[in-house]
Amino acid sequence: MSPTRMPALFLGHGSPMNVLEDNIYTRAWAHLGETLPRPKAIVVVSAHWFTRGTGVTAMEAPKTIHDFGGFPQALYDTHYPAPGSPALAQRLVELLSPVPVTLDKEAWGFDHGSWGVLIKMYPQADIPMVQLSIDSTKPPAWHLEMGRKLASLRDEDIMLVASGNVVHNLRTARWHGENTPYPWAESFNNYVKANLQWQGPDEQHPLVNYLAHEGGSLSNPTAEHFLPLLYILGAWDGVEAITIPVDGIEMGSLSMLSVVVGA
């Protein structure tokens, strides 16, 4: 392992309003950007690009996607003009083989799961980035293995950033007033934290089998916000430190847990 190996991050992105707000979560992301080694490029996996098959942004100047509605105009006026990297996109095609990866040269860009956190980490938007989609047709263990395939990039000064929420149930969210976590949400969030460093066969991994937890299906009625975590755990070497820079549950059922591997 390189002494300058880049960390791998899972960031609980939460509401798009975090882009405009100053709170414990946004300050934690900013602190990571200030204290972690500066990468030469970033590969980001966001819950908001959930596709059939795997794609990677491959344009020179990806657009900022405002994939949300009903928020203040200031949010739609905010852009994150980080450069793309067609060369890095091609590198992912080769690295992830035999998994077929489509080079997306115009359709996607950076959605709020990616730019919404990176605008706090690297507000200058001057680090080349590509975004990798999450294949909705694959089981959890497959995504863990994808993280393993990406791990070698960390020795090339490339940071892996995954963005989601390990508890994400908007149907039960308390949008106004009471903010106390639901017991099942707190239980599942604790279950995730307790199993971050689990080692053993993939098919037995508690976080691959997250729906077996009594609060798993309530915490994640759909998979897209949970799966990004598995990419980061797949990139762990089994020895390096795993730390939690910030944690919390907002609106009763939205976990803001963030995880850093290797810093």
Language-model segments: residues:
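Surface-exposed, charge/polar-rich loops and edge strands
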Residues: 94, 98, 127-128, 136-138, ...
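Solvent-exposed alpha-helices and their adjacent loops that cap or buttress functional pockets
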Residues: 2, 35-36, 121-125, 152
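Flexible, glycine/proline-enriched loop segments at strand-loop-helix junctions
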Residues: 75-83, 105, 133-140, 216
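Short, well-ordered beta-to-alpha junction loops that form the rim of enzyme active sites
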Residues: 46-48, 108, 158, 163-166
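Internal, conserved structured core segments that host functional sites
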Residues: 89-144, 149
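Conserved beta-strand elements of the Class I
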Residues: 9, 41-43, 128-130, 159-161
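Short, basic/glycine-rich phosphate-binding loops at helix/coil junctions
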Residues: 9-10, 67-72, 122-130, 207-208
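A short aromatic-anchored loop/beta-hairpin motif
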Residues: 2-103
